[in-house]
Amino acid sequence: EIGVQMFTLRRWTQTIEALREALARVKEIGYDTIQASAFGPMPVEEVAKAVADTGLTVGATHTPWPRLLSELDDVIAEHRVLNCRHTAVGMVPPDTYLSLAGLNQFVEEARVIVDKLGASGMTFSYHHHHHEFQHFEGKSWLQHLFNVSEDFELGFEIDTHWVVAGGA
């Protein structure tokens, strides 16, 4: 399903009123689903109502890495309110992608997140940027992540802009 990633519209999603207008415009131009990300602070129930009122659905979200690590139960509960079964991490701390040790730490933590989300009927993906194309031991950091994630259910959001920017 093709939808609008709302990060691009983040200037217009910082209040519930602005979000309602942005969602109405997204629906008006022909989309049926969104990826929720970078919204201003507002109750998830209000966001869910605004989405439903426009006839849209939330197909996916981006959740900050610190929240996934420390507030995963809340993240799951919020996704239930949004009727959304998929989240991705939009950005990880730089020490994660600057070394293979950082990758190994990420994988260890991501396995726990994948398992808990999976037990709740949800899936999880990694959204990359250009810096994951740095090479370590002859392969890009992202290729190393692909290789080690074969034995657990980590998805990947391939961003064509960042693929080109990363030189792949």
Label for each model-derived stretch:
Residues 109-115, 147-148:
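Histidine/acidic residue-rich metal-binding segments in metalloenzymes
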Residues 70-105, 109-110:
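Glycine/small-residue-rich loop that forms an oxyanion/phosphate-binding "nest" at active or ligand-binding sites
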Residues 34, 118-168:
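Acidic/histidine-rich catalytic cores of soluble enzymes
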Residues 1-86, 155:
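N-terminal pre-domain/capping segments
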Residues 53-54, 82, 113, 119-120, ...:
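Helix C-cap/helix->beta junction micro-motif
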Residues 17-21, 72-73, 102-111, 138-143, ...:
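Charged helix-capping and loop-helix junction motifs
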Residues 5-9, 37-39, 63-66, 92-94, ...:
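Active-site beta-loop-alpha junctions enriched in small/polar residues
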Residues 44, 97, 134:
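Glycine/Thr-rich phosphate-binding loops of Rossmann-like dinucleotide-binding domains
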